[in-house]
Amino acid sequence: MEIIRSYAKQLRRELTKEERRLWYLLRSRRFENYKFRRQHPVGNYILDFACCAARLAVELDGGQHDEKQKYDRQRTCWLNEKGWYVIRFWNNELWDNEEAVLEKILETLQMLHPSPRPTP
């Protein structure tokens, strides 16, 4: 587990420009007061972004080949079995329609972790 944590720490220092942008939008409870972590280890995996309270994993994907997609499916299955909900976005989705990405994250958070206080 220490190897995974060490690798996660390294990844936090080497974010892609897409990860940097999404982290800017999610960090420090800027996003609807939900707390997110970046490059968060869960088991033998490292999640791009995680809201632990809602058990939501947000993944950003670049160009992929078949082996990577198969790995991602297996990883998502394992995370689902552990109670995590995973949503994925392509890197270009963030640049092309940032608002839609944030809206989808918020809708998912509200579904998984509804606010204890109803909005007026």
Where are the regions a protein language model picked out?
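Solvent-exposed, charged helical/coil patches
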Residues: 1-34, 112-120
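A generic structural motif
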Residues: 34-35, 84
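Short acidic-hydrophobic surface loop/beta-edge motif
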Residues: 38-40
